[in-house]
Amino acid sequence: MSALDALLNPVYETKTKEVALGNRLIDPDTGKPATFTLRTMTTDERASIRKRCIVTRESGDGKYNEVDNESFLARCLVECCVNPDLKSTAFCTFPPREPGAKPIVVSPDVALKRRLLVPEYERLASAFMELNAMDESNPAEDAVTKN
């Protein structure tokens, strides 16, 4: 089989990984910690998200563009979370702060950061980075860098 055949007929399309974020989020059906299911992302998805996270900064030398890493990670998590659906209206809607006011609707990446505690968010982010080989200790990337 040639490399082209392998590319056109991959063994799998996407990998998934389930991760429990802690004991605070309990599945009402099982009574066990709820799990989030993450999937791998494509290079195109990553590039599209990265492009949306470019911000312009100013320094003494003028203006320059850089990636807002916090926004990039949150958007990647939303895009790659298969279950629960982090783009759902229910997830993105918060109760009004004042009686009689309308519910507050925010973007999925903002809702994710508001709903999860720091350790939960960190577990989800770590699982995402491991699944997509974006962790800092990736041996494949280390080998490429060394050569």
Which residues make up each language-model segment?
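A subset of signal/propeptide-processing and intrinsically disordered low-complexity segments
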Residues: 4, 8, 22, 78-80, ...
